[in-house]
Amino acid sequence: MIDKVFNKSITKQFEFDEEVASVFDDMLNRSVPFYKEMQRLSINFACNFLSENDKVYDLGCSTASTLIELSKHCKHNLKLIGIDNSDAMLKRASNKAKAFGVEIELINADLHDVTYNDAKLILSNYTLQFIRPLQREKLVKKIYDSLDEKGIFIFSEKVISTNSNLNKQCIDEYYEFKKTQGYSEFEISQKREALENVLIPYTEDENKKMIKDAGFSHCETIFKWVNFATFIAIK
């Protein structure tokens, strides 16, 4: 389905409800620049670290597209676990996994309440930015503690610049991108308002500091487009 969530006046803050879940895949592809390329790169990097029967968690798995793609492209059999707190998302994830013949354990839970046992890889695509900063850093420390030795954490985030002029230019460039994807000025402004105080981005350096503070030995930016970035962190 085509994303038309914000072509009407908003009455609430952004949330991953049934309306959003029904168009989420289209929303991602049209709202996140080079989303498919980011996903491809993340999977390629992940596959280089994975072995037979490794356990993989996707935090905020939404419709499970990344886990499904990982299963298709990785030569190993993996234990795939998707976690989300939206019933609507998990229902679609379950249907998609069945359609593609991919076995995924789907868990409806708050990310802070899950025990990530024996994880070799933890994924988080545009999820941390929706978690309040103090809780975000606690979760990243939990991720670090849960990973096997030499486990990896791959995550993507919207980022901001410390330079106000550059930050405005980045935002303007992003909105121009959204227009090329068929979103109107009204839809763009409505979504911006709905995300106010819901999505809280860090700078690229702040993300890397958070990772280092959690204990990771290395963090690298493997993809970036203006104010969207993908990182790989190695335990």
From Swiss-Prot:
Protein's job: Catalyzes the conversion of S-adenosyl-L-methionine (SAM) to carboxy-S-adenosyl-L-methionine (Cx-SAM).
PANTHER family registered for this protein in UniProt: CARBOXY-S-ADENOSYL-L-METHIONINE SYNTHASE, TRANS-ACONITATE 2-METHYLTRANSFERASE-RELATED
Domain of life (superkingdom): Bacteria
CDD domains: AdoMet_MTases
HAMAP family found in the cross-reference section: Cx_SAM_synthase
KW S-adenosyl-L-methionine (keyword) present: yes
Cystine residue pairs: none
Name the UniProt record assigns to this protein: Carboxy-S-adenosyl-L-methionine synthase
EC top class named in words: transferase
Keyword field contains Kinase: no
Molecular function in Gene Ontology: carboxyl- or carbamoyltransferase activity; S-adenosyl-L-methionine binding
Gene that specifies this protein: cmoA
